[in-house]
Structure formats: C-alpha cells, structure tokens
Amino acid sequence: MKILKDLIEKADDTLEEIEWYAEKAHHLRTEHKPLADCYIKIAEMHINIYNMLHEKMVMLIEEKKSKDVAVPHEMQVIWDYEHQKLIKEFAEAKYLIEEYKKMGY
C-alpha cells in the first residue's frame, strides 16, 4: 500500500528532524540557551506532527482489518517491523527532549 509506505517514510523523516533539533539543543544549551530553547520547541512541534502521522498509519491498518479485508501477510510483516522501529526511535527522540527539560528548560 503506497499510502502506508509514504506515511512510514514521512514519519521516519520527522523523527530525524526531532532528533536533530533535540541534539542541537543539548549542544547549544550553555553556549546559546535562547536558541537551544527554540530548538526544543521545534522538536516538540515535530512530536505533534509525528503523532498525527502515526495515528493515520494505525488507522489505515485498522480500516483494512475492520472491512474484513485480509491484510496481505507481507504487508503485515513490513508494518509490524516498521511500526516497532518507529516506536523505538520515537521513544529515543522523546527521551532527548525530556532530558533537556530536566536540565532546566
């Protein structure tokens, strides 16, 4: 399903953006705190974008299942793998943001 593939790719891109901004915020925290704070806010905005994409990915799979349309085995295997990978990467990105906040954001 091309739509699901596109959503997975976009979610992955969004996670990379979250990590980039969060890592930059950590590096700039002492050197330029206002910019670091801005980067964390942008990372948090990307969290919202990621959550919307994730919601739609899950919705697509659930729609297929609810219509009694068998999700092709290959598609389910790919989805399961990609979904777990995205969840793990999301947790790592979220951790970077939370660590920054603990340091006094």
Residue ranges and their predicted role:
Residues 1-105:
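Iron-associated oxidoreductase/ferritin-like identity signal
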